[in-house]
């Protein structure tokens, strides 16, 4: 079943760390089956606290989403995002069929 990884950016706290993340994160997509559906486009908050941005990535299934997230390439990039931004990231299964 299709799965989606959703990033919700609350705030960038260290621009230099985020530059490192932005340089390294694309390397983790190489050889992976994923499709960016939304990538820091215009965000309009309809309810709740406003966010700085959001990303939605589509994967064939939850296992592939975890394989990408847990990969050495993404983990190398992740350390910089964790130091450079306040984000929420989660995986959610799509609907069947």
Identify what each model region corresponds to.
Residues 1-53, 60-70, 93-97:
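Short S/T/G/P-rich N-terminal loop/turn motif that feeds into the first structured element of a domain
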Residues 66-90:
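C-terminal structural segments of small proteins and small subunits
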């Amino acid at each position: 079943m299709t799965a989606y990884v959703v990033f919700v950016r609350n705030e960038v706290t260290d621009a230099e760390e985020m530059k490192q993340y932005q340089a390294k994160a694309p390397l983790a997509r190489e050889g992976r089956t994923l499709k960016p559906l939304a990538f820091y486009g215009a965000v309009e908050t309809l309810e709740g606290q406003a966010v700085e941005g959001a990303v939605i990535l589509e994967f064939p299934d939850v296992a592939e989403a975890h394989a990408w997230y847990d990969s050495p390439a993404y983990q190398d990039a992740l350390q910089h995002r964790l130091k450079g931004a306040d984000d929420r990231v989660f995986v959610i299964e799509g609907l069947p069929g």
